[in-house]
């Protein structure tokens, strides 16, 4: 933090971008290995977030402190305005809710909270099988990254709060 403000406006300025038309993406869903690729991507996402969380926790323990704020921003996303983090409740997971995700799902583009709240959010990988089963029972056989994060918070009693932060994926 510099002057109590996290500056994120410089986080993503690509030199080039490859645009994949939605029709091409939709056709990919018909490919025979699509499901296994998607599951691999989801597992990789949760594993990577968990590993980053472990590094953060090791640093906190080694230096005998807890971060006031932990911010998780997807590397391909760009916040469209400055966020004054100290205005928000750090005991909950705050997230960009401007997409109005259904069923209480938690958008995974920009998420932040105190060390404890984000520890639960970022540790979803450790409980994926149990969380998937809960999601499948509650949502008719379906689950998603957004649902898994929500269920992890529910299991550990961590609240979540959407905010109208506009976060874009520059490739779209």
Where are the regions that the model predicts?
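ER/Golgi luminal nucleotide-sugar-dependent glycosyltransferases, focusing on the catalytic module
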Residues: 1-172
């Amino acid at each position: 933090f510099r002057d109590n403000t996290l500056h994120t406006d410089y986080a993503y300025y690509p030199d080039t971008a490859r645009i994949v038309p939605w029709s091409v993406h939709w056709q990919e869903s018909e490919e025979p290995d699509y499901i296994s690729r998607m599951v691999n991507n989801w597992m990789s996402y949760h594993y990577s977030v968990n590993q980053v969380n472990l590094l953060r926790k090791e640093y906190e323990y080694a230096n005998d402190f807890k971060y006031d704020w932990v911010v998780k921003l997807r590397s391909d996303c760009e916040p469209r305005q400055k966020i004054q983090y100290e205005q928000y409740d750090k005991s909950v997971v705050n997230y960009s809710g401007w997409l109005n995700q259904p069923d209480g799902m938690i958008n995974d583009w920009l998420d932040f909270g105190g060390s404890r709240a984000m520890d639960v959010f970022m540790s979803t990988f450790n409980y994926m099988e149990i969380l998937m089963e809960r999601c499948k029972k509650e949502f008719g056989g379906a689950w998603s990254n957004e649902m898994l994060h929500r269920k992890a918070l529910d299991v550990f009693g961590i609240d979540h709060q959407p905010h109208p932060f506009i976060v874009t994926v520059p490739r779209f």
